[in-house]
Amino acid sequence: MTDNIILEGLKSFGVEKAEDKAIVLSSYLDLVMSFNPSLKLVGEKERDEIARRHILDSASAYPVFLENTEAGDQIGDLGSGAGFPGIVLAILFPDRNFVLIDRMTRRIGFLRIVKAKLNLENVEILDKDVKDVKRNFRVITCRAFRPLAEIGDEVVALTSSAILYKAVEDNIEKELETLRFQGFVFNASILPVSIPGEKARRSIVVMKEWRKP
């Protein structure tokens, strides 16, 4: 079964082969719904609410990833949790490779189930704290993770580029200013996005040439 909410949302973001990808995302939502009562993956309980607030929210950055990444790129998802945005992006971009990083055992177990059930060959799962990861990524991403000022050193050890999901109520400019005060240099763009059916707005922060001289 395909959730119409997901399909229409993907179409609004300009996703290629939206119908096929909506089917896989609906199967992913089935797994979230099935395991959520025992694993407490997300706070919401209603299917449509999870579809909007987590799956479509994760998919909203599709145009940004399309523009800033390419086939074969390795993308790290910090604190992947239940797979938002990493699993969603892996479904939307089967030609990119996604490394999902989390240190909570129950979440890691769920991610492994999702990878197996959905045959996501472009997904790798790391059961590690971010600071212990020794890899180089084309770009990293994270959603509902820690403030930028708390992850600066960890990020620049992995990459110089990031695509970050931030709530509008987050004081993004203040977070960026704190990074500068800490000695980081970067080029940052703040892009507003909206989720069909959701009043809450989201910003995508694109960080380039992020480093600490």
Regions found by a protein language model. Give the residues of each.
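Class I SAM-dependent transferase core
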Residues: T2-G76, R106-G109, I113-V123
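Residue-level signal for inorganic ion chemistry
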Residues: V32, L89, M207
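Conserved S-adenosyl-L-methionine
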Residues: D77-G81
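S-adenosylmethionine
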Residues: D95-P213
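Conserved SAM-binding loop of SAM-dependent methyltransferases across substrates and taxa
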Residues: A82-D95
